[in-house]
C-alpha cells in the first residue's frame, strides 16, 4: 500500500522566497516508491494553456487572481495525476490552501461523482469535468433534461474505479466558481460533494478566524 499525496496551492502562490504552507509541506515529505507526491501552483500564477498570445496569457492570469479562472484546469491536472499513479489499496491524501483548498475539495467531489477513470481514458476527463460542473436548476426540469447524477452513475460504472480519499487537509477554503441563470434568477455556482466531504475518511480544516478581506 502506497500513499499518494496531492498538494494544491492557493491563489497566486508558487515557489518563491516566501513559500506557502503547501510548498513547505511538499518539501517536508519523503518521496519514494511508497509515497508519490504531486504539487500544483495556484490559480493566477500562469496564463491559460489555451491562450495563444502573451496578452491572452496575461489576461487569464489576472482573471485567475481575481476570480479563480483556471480552477477547472487545476482540478483536471490533479485528477490526471491520480489516473496515472493510483493502484488498488493506495491511500490518497489531498491538501490545499485558499482556492487550492477548494481545488482539493472539488477533486474529492469529482472522485465521488465520477470515480477515477481507468488508464487509457484520458480523453474522458473533459467530459467528466463538464458533467461535474454542470449547474442544474429548474430550467432542466422544464426541459426534461436527465439529472447529471443519473448520467454520472452510469458513466462511473462504465469507465471508472472507486477511489475514496483517505485524508483532506485544508487551509482557509475560498470557493469562486461563477454564477448561472435559473428560473429564480442569478444563482451562485457550486460543485457537488464539496461541502461536508462525507466521502473522505478524515477531514481537517484550519481557518483564520480573524482574517479581514476586502471582498
Map each language-model feature to its residues.
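Alpha-helical segment proximal to the catalytic Tyr-Lys
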Residues: 1-215
Amino acid at each position: 500500500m502506497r500513499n499518494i499525496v496531492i498538494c494544491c496551492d492557493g491563489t497566486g502562490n508558487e515557489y518563491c522566497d516566501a513559500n506557502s504552507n503547501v510548498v513547505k509541506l511538499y518539501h517536508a515529505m519523503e518521496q519514494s516508491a511508497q509515497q508519490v507526491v504531486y504539487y500544483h501552483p495556484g490559480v493566477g500564477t500562469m496564463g491559460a494553456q489555451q491562450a495563444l498570445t502573451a496578452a491572452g496569457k496575461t489576461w487569464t492570469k489576472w482573471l485567475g487572481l481575481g476570480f479563480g479562472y483556471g480552477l477547472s484546469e487545476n482540478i483536471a491536472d490533479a485528477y490526471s495525476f491520480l489516473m496515472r499513479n493510483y493502484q488498488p489499496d493506495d491511500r490518497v491524501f489531498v491538501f490545499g490552501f485558499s482556492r487550492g483548498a477548494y481545488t482539493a475539495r472539488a477533486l474529492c467531489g469529482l472522485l465521488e461523482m465520477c470515480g477515477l477513470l481507468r488508464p487509457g481514458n484520458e480523453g474522458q476527463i473533459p467530459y467528466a469535468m463538464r458533467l461535474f460542473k454542470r449547474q442544474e436548476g429548474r430550467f432542466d426540469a422544464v426541459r426534461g433534461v436527465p439529472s447529471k447524477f443519473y448520467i454520472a452513475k452510469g458513466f462511473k460504472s462504465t469507465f471508472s474505479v472507486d477511489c475514496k480519499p483517505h485524508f483532506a487537509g485544508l487551509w482557509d477554503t475560498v470557493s469562486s466558481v461563477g454564477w448561472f441563470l435559473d428560473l429564480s434568477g442569478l444563482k451562485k455556482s457550486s460543485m457537488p460533494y464539496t461541502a461536508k466531504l462525507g466521502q473522505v475518511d478524515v477531514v481537517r480544516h484550519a481557518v483564520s478566524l480573524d482574517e479581514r478581506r476586502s471582498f
